[in-house]
A protein has these predicted regions:
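Conserved helicase/translocase motor-coupling segment
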Residues: 188-281
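Conserved segment of the helicase C-terminal RecA-like domain
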Residues: 253, 293-306
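Conserved RecA-like helicase motor-core motifs
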Residues: 2-21, 137-149, 217-234
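Conserved interdomain linker/interface between the two RecA-like ATPase lobes of SF2 helicase motors
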Residues: 137-208
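Short basic/glycine-enriched coil/helix segment immediately N-terminal to the Walker B
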Residues: 48-52, 68-84, 252-255
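Post-DEXD/H (motif II) to motif III coupling segment of the RecA-like Helicase ATP-binding lobe
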Residues: 74-83, 90-162
Length: 306
């Protein structure tokens, strides 16, 4: 490869099903290619994937930094020379968080830049992650009391600084109503009959299947959850983005109901006119609300105004 060509690697269990990744040129780039990106077979081995120039992976690949396992030194070598970006850092449970903090200790000892992203990270959790990266147990508690939003917190390895960021986006007030399962059909009909689309996010696959069956006689229903086999899930995700994504049309959205589980609440750029959700922790509820009136669309149904 030419000196300026960069090797990219997608490192997760369904990488072979990702069409964008599979369409990147493999081996030595052709002279007429100007993308500068290639896939090299040498890096396709899971133990060596982290050594590529750019790597996109699921978080469990990074958490293995904290484990005593064969070939872990290759992971340390690969990540220590990169900028590590971890998205949705609020979403990890107590078990994963222990491994995350240990991994941050390693990265901090290498002076590896780490960027943690979240829209709903509690202040106490923010401080515990910084303590792990710096390898310290205590510091000025005024940093934990800072409640600005959006808030940027950073450290150069010695001092900790925080800065409130300006937010130019439109603020919205969300109307919240409680309902029981028997009322869901009527709530949905009120929106879909006026040309709107509805998202229904529940906490189990069984409930998602139940609501999809319940609603299919009154609306177009798309069911999406994590138990679909990977090829089907990839097709459904593309269909979902086409129907209710940023570039979706009023025709594709009209009368549509998307029923799913927690896989709908993160990392999908989709937009519902009305959202129905099970009870859930507040940070997850805010994530789900992020799929409500996400894009500017002009007029929405009267029954789905915020």
């Amino acid at each position: 490869a030419e000196q300026n060509d960069k090797v990219v690697q997608l490192n997760h269990g369904s990488a072979a099903l990702n069409s964008l990744f599979q369409n990147i040129q493999r081996g030595i780039p052709q002279e007429e290619s100007d993308s500068g990106l290639i896939i090299h077979n040498w890096f396709c081995d899971s133990k060596k994937a982290c050594l590529a120039d750019f790597v996109t992976a699921t978080v469990d690949q990074m958490l293995m930094l904290a484990l005593k396992r064969k070939h872990v030194m290759l992971l340390h070598l690969g990540l220590s020379e990169k900028v590590v970006v971890i998205d949705e850092v609020h979403a990890y449970d107590a078990y994963m968080s222990e491994y995350l903090e240990m991994a941050l200790q390693w990265l901090g000892s290498y002076n590896t830049p780490v960027i943690l992203l979240s829209a709903t990270l509690p202040s106490a959790r923010r401080m515990s992650l910084i303590r792990a990266y710096l390898g310290i147990k205590k510091f000025d508690d005024r940093f934990e009391k800072e409640q600005g939003y959006p808030l940027l917190t950073w450290t150069d390895g010695k001092d900790i600084r925080q800065q409130r960021l300006s937010y130019d986006g439109a603020h919205k007030t969300v109307s919240v109503k409680t309902c029981v399962s028997d009322d869901v059909v009527q709530f949905v009909k009120n929106v879909t009959e006026n040309g709107g689309c509805v998202g229904v996010i529940v906490n189990t696959v069984r409930r998602a299947q139940m609501f999809a069956e319940l609603l299919q006689d009154n609306a177009k229903v798309l069911l999406y959850h994590a138990q679909f086999v990977l090829p089907d899930r990839a097709k459904k995700e593309k269909q979902l983005v086409d129907l209710v994504g940023k570039n979706s049309t009023p025709e594709s959205r009209s009368g549509l109901v998307v029923v799913g589980t927690q896989v709908l609440e993160q990392s999908l750029d989709i937009d519902f006119d009305m959202l129905i959700t099970d009870m859930c922790p507040m940070d997850l509820l805010l994530q789900r609300m992020g799929r409500l009136h996400r894009h500017e669309r002009g007029v929405r149904p009267d029954t789905a105004q915020t």
